[in-house]
Amino acid sequence: MLKEALEVVTAKRDLDYGQVKNLLDSILEGELDEMKFGAFLAALKTKGETKEEISAFVDAFYEKAQKIEYTHPKTIDTCGTGGDGKGTFNISTASAIVLSCFDLKVAKHGNRSITSNSGSADILENLGIDIQAPPQRILEGLEKHNFAFLFAPKYHPATKKVATVRKSLGIRTVFNILGPLLNPVSLNYQVVGAFDFEAQEKIASVLKGKRKRAAIIHSLDGLDEISVSQKTRVLELQGDNIKEYYIDPKEYGIEYTLDDIKGYTPQENAKIFRSILNGEVSAYYWAVVLNSAFALYIAEVANDIEEGIALCQSAIKKGDAMLKLKDLQQHYKVGA
């Protein structure tokens, strides 16, 4: 089956959903020919993955995932693809904690660092949050504190089977866009940062019609976040509609360089995050406020980004955001 699929994609022909899904099901249930599968992933990338092919990957791995059975009308995730190569501070992770100050249930899907100095799991660990909390504590955390961190390897054991192939290839493949599409919690709202414009469009095509409202973002200076230095392209999804527009940070009086939001070690990033929650105004502060504000708009908490900025600044100024972090540290205490 893998040999036939490899021949098709090498000839630059598309596979349909069923062909890819059946292939992946057989691979995940049986033996994996790593060399052939690596060649298949590389050929698929060269050809360009279609919506149907990506959807088959999502469904095959989601079926094998350990799910968190939690239903709420205001579930949201801010997980991006990562891999933009810019080495910035953990903006989406910090934003996720700010968002949990509001009437939202933030199911933050994430992993350790792959290309940056510090991944979402790394910074949260340094903030004293148990990234491998048991499911019951996750459910209680969502219900009582509006936040849970879902450590990807814990919920997606099937990905271990292909980890060696991915590592040996050393190139971006379809797997680089799967992370945000595989949250173990059912989501109604989502903001997804993409590592390039092509990935942005592919993710939008796959997510279309699957969330109440979502946005896929990529900035002109290459970030999988809303940038504080350049315009960010947004593909906003509502129902079957995709709306394209740009966010200019200058419109909100925000103007910094990429160097101003550089990320460091997990320990240093945790320190920066505490300074943000203490209200110390900096490029980091504005990056987190702007990204949080946009997520509030997407999640229908704020009517627009401007209102979202005011809400986020107020949550930080009043101390709600710092109090939220302390509550999360207590609830998700390691060994508790």
UniProtKB/Swiss-Prot annotation:
Q: Which domain of life is it from?
A: Bacteria
Positions of disulphide bridges = none
Q: In which pathway does it act?
A: Amino-acid biosynthesis; L-tryptophan biosynthesis; L-tryptophan from chorismate: step 2/5
GO biological process per UniProt: L-tryptophan biosynthetic process
Q: For this protein, what is the EC number?
A: 2.4.2.18
State the InterPro entries in the record.
Anthranilate_Pribosyl_Tfrase, Glycosyl_Trfase_fam3, Glycosyl_Trfase_fam3_N_dom, Glycosyl_Trfase_fam3_N_dom_sf, Nuc_phospho_transferase
Q: What is this protein called?
A: Anthranilate phosphoribosyltransferase
